[in-house]
């Protein structure tokens, strides 16, 4: 994918006829604008504004005879007064990167009346090789107050085709959907999961928020701690590895009931969470708090007399040492803390074990009840529309095909109306008061994926409701907090994907989503919402016979371990070229089972290590985050492992030349696509945010403070 695909399209275009004094002889093809009764404020008239009528659009617009500017909405005078500042020297400066600009540089941000809305303009952005379909216009426009400078809420079907074309023209491209797949599978039948519906998704999101709140309250009330960061998200990932239930998100049929992931992360934070320490006073305070929390816990729980004696003696010894040692260094305090943890940790964990298991069990059983409620709601929606919940499976012809998106066996019910409006470069989609947001560029990406993959909605009547369900699903899966869950959805930089495709034939992502995928063929967590946008289903259910794949799994230990088992089984059973290039954290203290198994696998052809802070990931919130927050530095080493069978190694082997080019691709920072006008101060603050965000990738593996 060429680098110019990351640029922004040209949007400036003047009207054919502006000034009422323009001679008809000089521009014979340009009709004169029809003037309306001028009911404008005196300030606007003095500034050169007048009200005209658009014959083509059959509505009024506002034209400035001094600047040749045209607006659909009534202008509001801002910083740039054309009389006192005709050149706009005092106006708000535009960023040098025009891809950030969607509105004129005035405070009201009124939408320009441009020919770019009415006809395609030449630009360097990769355009789809398909025509934009004419969408139905029978749906009504919901009533909404019209605020000056803000587009009115509209239903997708009520917009004209030209305006849709302008909306669907991306300004930033971080994908290449033209690459065809080389992944071959056996022909498979449709999935039995129920099709998504906004009412069902709304109920599911409400119940997940309640479940998160239950988890927080249980941790606070029973253990006196805040929930470990991202532990609920990793609990859902770990549970879905073993879950045999019917819900695509919440677990309902798991063995064992107590989640190893949730249990491990809560126990790591008992009696208190140990954070990274930079200063001596912090180390002293942490040692005191740990000793106090350990004594309080052992006194309030049922524990053996020996355990109580050991903990209390070590705590008193620590307090005595703190009273005597006034000149201790940070290292002295940390050594003392490590000694206290070794002495008291096993006894504290034994005393808290039953309580923590109770938290895990309680959350699972609440989830089970919620799944029943969601299922009842879903079946009621199908019954209301006379759609059977079970469809008789037809016989499949045993043949090999290139992989294709997931199809659903159950027919989709009619979709309710969903509201959409655009705020600057963000598309806002609202259903029953619940709003989700996505940038215009990623909205256009979803449109393309839907156009390529969906087979039951050629008129795009269900596009917006399905986008709302998709965005709401991922929002609920990773939480609504700032930067929450973004590390679990991080992806590789564009330069790396380009290199993987060019050198190793990679055309498929094993762990992605419609929002962060680079290729149009990928596996994702949710076949019901994502199948309409190109997903081939969950990776652990996907069984290719040949092809070259990239795998960057969410950093959940149980999921990564299951991934290794799945890949080795596929490599063992296939005689066709098969290759998996896996990117996982190089956690060594202790090493993860997945990393250890891949290093010892007979299919490992090479292992590459990318040093911490010398390579980047793309944010999991790339579909909505600011441009300067799109990339962040990894705070841990990343191990790149090549798992290939014999034919795959012969075809896509990691030769020294290929490895050198792959390493060089990581040196091309994705930040170079950002605005070059950013100041050094904003860059440094952005880097700090990036590092904080990067820590989300492995909080369960954070080293103990040193």
Swiss-Prot record:
Residues annotated to bind S-adenosyl-L-methionine: 552-555, 613-615
Span of the annotated motif Nuclear localization signal: 109-113, 668-686
Bias kind Polar residues: ranges: 16-29
InterPro entries: HSP70_C_sf, PCIF1-like, PCIF1_WW, WW_dom, WW_dom_sf
Presence of the UniProt keyword Methyltransferase in the record: yes
Compositional bias segments (type: Basic and acidic residues): 687-706
A GO MF term: RNA polymerase II C-terminal domain phosphoserine binding
WW domain residues: 43-77
Catalytic reaction(s) noted: a 5'-end (N(7)-methyl 5'-triphosphoguanosine)-(2'-O-methyladenosine) in mRNA + S-adenosyl-L-methionine = a 5'-end (N(7)-methyl 5'-triphosphoguanosine)-(N(6),2'-O-dimethyladenosine) in mRNA + S-adenosyl-L-homocysteine + H(+)
Gene3D superfamilies with a match to the protein in the record: 1.20.1270.10, 2.20.70.10
Regulation: Cap-specific adenosine methyltransferase activity is inhibited by zinc.
EC number: 2.1.1.62
Modified residue annotations for Phosphoserine: 30, 116
GO biological process, one term: negative regulation of translation
Residue numbers binding substrate: 234, 264, 557, 587-591
Record localization: Nucleus
Biased composition (Low complexity): 132-147, 675-686
Swiss-Prot/TrEMBL domain comment: The WW domain is sufficient for direct and specific interaction with the phosphorylated CTD of RNAPII largest subunit.
Subunit structure: Interacts with POLR2A; interacts with the phosphorylated C-terminal domain (CTD) of POLR2A.
Function, as annotated: Cap-specific adenosine methyltransferase that catalyzes formation of N(6),2'-O-dimethyladenosine cap (m6A(m)) by methylating the adenosine at the second transcribed position of capped mRNAs. Recruited to the early elongation complex of RNA polymerase II (RNAPII) via interaction with POLR2A and mediates formation of m6A(m) co-transcriptionally.
Protein name: mRNA (2'-O-methyladenosine-N(6)-)-methyltransferase
Organism: Mus musculus
Gene that this sequence comes from: Pcif1
């Amino acid at each position: 994918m060429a680098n110019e695909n990351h640029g922004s399209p040209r949007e400036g275009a003047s009207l054919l006829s502006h000034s009422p004094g323009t001679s008809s002889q000089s521009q014979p093809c340009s009709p004169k604008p029809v003037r309306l009764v001028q009911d404008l404020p005196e300030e606007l008239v003095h500034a050169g504004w007048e009200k005209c009528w658009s014959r083509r659009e059959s509505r009024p617009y506002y034209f400035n005879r001094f600047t040749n500017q045209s607006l659909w909405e009534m202008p509001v005078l801002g910083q740039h007064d054309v009389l006192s500042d005709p050149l706009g020297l005092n106006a708000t400066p535009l960023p040098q990167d025009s891809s950030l600009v969607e509105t004129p540089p005035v405070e009201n941000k009124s939408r320009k009346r441009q020919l770019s809305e009415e006809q395609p303009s030449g630009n360097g952005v990769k355009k789809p090789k398909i025509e934009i379909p004419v969408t139905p216009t029978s749906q009504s426009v919901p009533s909404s107050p019209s605020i000056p400078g803000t587009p009115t809420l509209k239903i997708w079907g009520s917009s004209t085709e030209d305006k849709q074309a302008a909306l669907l023209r991306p300004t930033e491209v971080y994908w290449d959907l033209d690459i065809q797949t080389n992944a071959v599978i056996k022909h498979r039948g449709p999935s039995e999961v129920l099709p998504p519906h906004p009412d069902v998704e709304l109920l599911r999101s409400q119940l997940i928020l309640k479940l998160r709140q239950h988890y927080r309250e249980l941790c606070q009330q029973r253990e006196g701690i805040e929930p470990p960061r991202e532990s609920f998200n990793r609990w859902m990932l770990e549970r879905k590895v073993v879950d045999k239930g019917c819900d695509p998100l919440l677990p309902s049929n798991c063995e064992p009931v107590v989640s190893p992931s949730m249990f491990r992360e809560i126990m790591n934070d008992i009696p208190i969470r140990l954070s990274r320490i930079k200063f001596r006073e912090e180390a002293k305070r942490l040692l005191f708090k740990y000793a106090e929390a350990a004594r309080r816990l052992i006194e309030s729980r049922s524990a053996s007399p020996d355990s109580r004696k050991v903990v209390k003696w070590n705590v008193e010894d620590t307090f005595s040492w703190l009273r005597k040692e006034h000149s201790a260094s940070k290292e002295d305090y940390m050594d003392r803390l490590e000694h206290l943890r070794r002495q008291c940790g096993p006894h504290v964990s034994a005393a808290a074990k039953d309580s923590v298991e109770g938290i895990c069990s309680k959350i699972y059983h609440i989830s089970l009840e919620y799944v029943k409620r969601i299922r009842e709601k879903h079946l009621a929606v199908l019954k209301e529309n006379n759609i059977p919940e079970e469809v008789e499976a037809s016989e499949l012809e045993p043949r090999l095909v290139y992989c294709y998106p997931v199809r659903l066996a159950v027919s989709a019910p009619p979709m309710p109306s969903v509201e959409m409006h655009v705020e600057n470069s963000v598309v806002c989609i609202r259903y029953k008061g619940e709003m989700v947001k996505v940038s215009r560029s990623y909205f256009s990406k979803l449109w393309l994926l839907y156009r390529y993959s969906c087979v039951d909605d050629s008129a795009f009547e269900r596009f917006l409701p399905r986008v709302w369900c998709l965005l709401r699903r991922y929002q609920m899966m990773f939480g609504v907090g700032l930067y929450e869950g973004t590390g679990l959805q991080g992806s590789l930089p564009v330069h790396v994907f380009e290199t993987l495709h060019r050198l190793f034939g990679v055309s498929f992502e094993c762990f992605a989503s419609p929002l962060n995928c680079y290729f149009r063929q990928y596996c994702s967590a949710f076949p019901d919402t994502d199948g309409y946008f190109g997903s081939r289903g969950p990776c652990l259910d996907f069984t290719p016979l040949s092809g070259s794949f990239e795998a960057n799994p969410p950093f959940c230990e149980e999921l990564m371990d299951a991934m290794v088992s799945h890949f080795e089984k596929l490599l063992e059973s296939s005689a066709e070229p098969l290759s998996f290039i896996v990117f996982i954290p190089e956690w060594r203290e202790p090493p993860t089972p997945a990393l250890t198994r891949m290093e010892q696998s007979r299919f490992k052809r090479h292992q590459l290590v990318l040093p911490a802070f010398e390579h980047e990931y793309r944010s999991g919130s790339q579909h909505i985050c600011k441009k300067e927050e799109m990339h962040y530095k990894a705070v841990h080493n990343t191990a790149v492992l090549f798992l290939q069978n014999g034919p795959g190694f012969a075809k896509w082997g990691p030769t020294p030349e290929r490895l050198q080019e792959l390493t060089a691709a990581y040196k091309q920072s994705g930040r170079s696509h950002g605005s070059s006008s950013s100041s050094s101060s904003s860059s440094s603050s952005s880097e700090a945010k990036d590092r904080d965000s990067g820590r989300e990738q492995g909080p369960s593996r954070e080293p103990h403070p040193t």
